[in-house]
Amino acid sequence: KPYLLHEYGNASQPYSFARQPKKAIQEARESIASCIGALPEEIYFTSGGTESDNWAIKGIAFQNYDHRATITTAFEHHAVLHACEAIERLGCPVAYMLPDKRVFVSRDSLERYITDETFLVSVMYANNELGSIQPIKELCKVAHDHGALFHTDAVQAVGHVAINVNDLGV
């Protein structure tokens, strides 16, 4: 509340009115980083999960000039699915993995889809509608072993499972 009513300076500016908001943002960045095993400078603030997913998926695709493939699941959050549809329209092929009957994507399942042409794998950590929690560390290792980047939407996992981005490999 104080940053809406009294200390509303632009935290990105060098003037004195911006000092308190800038300090608050830095403290928030440090707090979040410590919760997920990241460095403060690795934390970026967006308007929410949808914008973050778009930054990750589309940003990677825009630098993927040779249009290599992306793999995701058929049961991702719509933010991821819509971002994948957008990159498909740009000529980037996307494969949609189907889960097993427990709504689970195994390492073996990803191994069946991934090739050395895969550029990005995106799998939601915890699905808020289905209740499934994916083995992100294992899936990330498969992606990295094939030279692919790995993205996970972990918004629904926060507070339910321990998250350490370095341990997970994301």
Region locations from a protein language model:
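Pyridoxal 5′-phosphate
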Residues: 1-170
